[in-house]
Amino acid sequence: MASENVGVCHLRINDTNPIKEDVEYEDSIKAAVRWLGFDWGPHLYHASDYFDRLYEFARHLIKAGLAYVDSSSPDEMRLLRGTLTTPGQASRYRERDVAENLDLFRRMKEGEFPDGAHVLRLKIDLASPNINLRDPAIYRIRHTTHHRTGDKWCVYPLYDYTHSISDALERITHSLCTLEFQDHRPLYDWVIERLADAGLLQRPLPQQHEFARLNLTYTVMSKRKLLELVEGGHVEGWDDPRMPTLVGLRRRGYTPESIRLFAERIGVTKSDSWIDLSVLEDCLRDELNERAERRIAVLDPLKLVIDNYPADGVEDCFAPNHPQHPELGRRPRPLHRELWIERDDFQAHHPTACFRLSTAADGRPRYVYDIPDHGAPSAAG
């Protein structure tokens, strides 16, 4: 999309959770993107690049009365949030004054509290039919070393808050997500609109667009379920050839060109649908058919003896590496007195319409010349 519109595409690593992200995780993403044939150039970013600004933006929201520190337990917050049919209820900490909220948030940053003691929540609408707008948490305490920032931080922003602001700071125009984030878009817009109104973010603001996730027949695509396979030792790892990951497909023999062709053929849609696995396989077949050099193998060999050919004779014959691309050259196929053919390609007695080698007809091995048949091949093999 970026190339078609003379734009640029950013690669951003969402490293807001130090428990889950590490250098290996990041390197595997970059390696997969490079393997597909894409280069982000100077546009590599990390959510952690913006930790200082994200923290200051959160302080602004507190000062504006749009955020508060909630000391409720996770179970209490879950009960107060309500359901799809019942509105949420206010936490008893929702009306803390600005000074207390700022002080608690500062002390959270300085490491005074254990994990889970407090969270910073936005003050939006507890009666909203969209549960994502019922005072979502945007900061949590995590006393864990971050692979890029070390121990500088023990409070970390959550994805929805970080995602929208990072897009705005990078001057993104189109932020593309899968359909599961469609209900998160109002929160995405709410955050950056409030900060833009305060002059902290520049307009025009980015827009989030959603598309359907890929569903392949006979294929488990859920990251959670694939993680269970990896952690349970049912597969060798994420690059197991049975896994539908990029590294798994690579080990299975798929090429980056075939995967890009697959993406072009199925297109982008907002409707959930299932793509037959054969479409992916056809893309690999079509891509390899264009450039793969040909080779011949005999799987069920039957010895063929040319009885009037010198026992020590060798004659060079040649086969094209690709029948449609002569520029790929030829490969030698030495002709000897003894050859091997597929057992199914011989039939001692056959009907008139049979095109196999037989005792009553001449035969011509591929890329050689006609060989008259004067007897049945030996049973060796």
Stretches found by the model and what they are:
Residues 25-51, 57-58, 65-68:
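A glycine-rich helix N-cap at a beta->alpha junction
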Residues 229-251:
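Extended, non-catalytic structural segments that build the interaction scaffolds
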Residues 219-227, 246-264, 309:
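Core structural elements
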Residues 28-35, 214-237:
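Flexible glycine/proline-rich, aromatic-decorated loop/lid segments
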Residues 190, 228, 261-292:
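Hydrophobic, mid-to-C-terminal alpha-helical segments
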Residues 12-20, 42-52, 75, 214-215, ...:
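Conserved short loop/turn motifs at secondary-structure junctions
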Residues 1-7:
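Histidine-anchored nucleotide/phosphate-binding helix
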Residues 11, 15-17, 23, 64-226, ...:
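Active-site cores that bind ATP or allylic diphosphates and position pyrophosphate for catalysis
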